[in-house]
Swiss-Prot record:
Its EC number is 1.2.7.3. The keyword Oxidoreductase applies. The gene is korC. GO terms for molecular function: 2-oxoglutarate synthase activity. Pfam families: POR. Keywords: Oxidoreductase. The keyword Isomerase does not apply. Heterotetramer of the KorA, KorB, KorC and KorD subunits. It catalyses: 2 oxidized [2Fe-2S]-[ferredoxin] + 2-oxoglutarate + CoA = succinyl-CoA + 2 reduced [2Fe-2S]-[ferredoxin] + CO2 + H(+). This is 2-oxoglutarate synthase subunit KorC.
Amino acid sequence: MNKRRVKMRKEIRLSGFGGQGIILAGVILGRAAALYDNKEAVQTQSYGPEARGGASKSEVVISDEPIDFPKVIKPDILVCLSQQAYDKYKDDIKEGGVVLVDEDLVSTDKMPEVDVTMYKIPFTRIASEEIKLPIVANIVMLGALTRLTNIVSKESMEKAILDSVPKGTEEKNLLAFSKGYEVAKEL
């Protein structure tokens, strides 16, 4: 009997504003998938002309086969760390997709047009209050994303974080990842 293997292709869009580490988060996610989980991955990014405060987007496509089209069309996973990003991208999500928002920064009064699983997590508050470093909210988010979606393994993500963050910040970033992973365990 000839069994056809189902291809796995997941499209992830991370969005927010400049200065939140959206691009770095996408790089870390792509690196975890490609280098440590032995998957195919491509990461693209775009941001406004402002150095900080403008729109920022990082997209990652992860597949178990070569990626023939590197752009995200209908994300399976959407992360929004700003209201502007949520308002702009909420209706792009695939039916049955997963949406993660920073509950302190994003109002979800207007839901996506399709059925999704929505997680509201205070990424920035966790980074500020528990790690005393608001800048690691993006890494808190990656912890929750990893736990909730299993898109990459926890171990691969930890290795990719160590590869990607500035020297001297590894411990704080791993703590941020761990906090995000733990808070998602309770959801």
